[in-house]
Amino acid sequence: MNIADLRKEIVSSDAKVAFDAIVDGFSGQVGMSMNAHEQGFLNSLRIYRDSDYCFAAVPNDEWVLAYIRKPELRRGKLTVDGVMAAFPEARLTNQGEVTLRIRDAGTAARWLAMIRSAA
């Protein structure tokens, strides 16, 4: 499995553009890396800050489910309250991670800008 395979799982053209924006946005950041991950029926893009698995993007037919994971939240530069204020549609999981359904490139750009500002 590779990143192109993940993109093929998306049906919506807007969500494909959003996925591309996420991949491009993290590709250009120093200290960030990513890889496609396959686990049963749930395939994801794992995004690392140095060696910490801080973010994920899970393709869906109509959106990309973006995760801000606990290792990133523990850094203290992004907070659950801050993310929820910026994205009221975001949700907090039972594991204490923040998820957001990203359906378009504009939302992807806002999400990436928030992450970059917390670098």
Predicted features and spans:
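Short, conserved beta-strand/beta-arch hydrophobic-aromatic motifs that form part
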Residues: 37-95
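Well-ordered alpha/beta subsegment
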Residues: 89-119
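N-terminal first-folded block
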Residues: 24-33
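Charge-rich, low-complexity N-terminal segments
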Residues: 1-25, 38
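Generic structural signal for short, solvent-exposed loop/turn connectors between secondary structure elements
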Residues: 1, 14, 59-62, 119
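Residues that form generic nucleotide/phosphate-binding pockets
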Residues: 9, 25, 86, 114, ...
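Exposed alpha-helical structural elements
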Residues: 5, 18-21, 79-82, 107-110
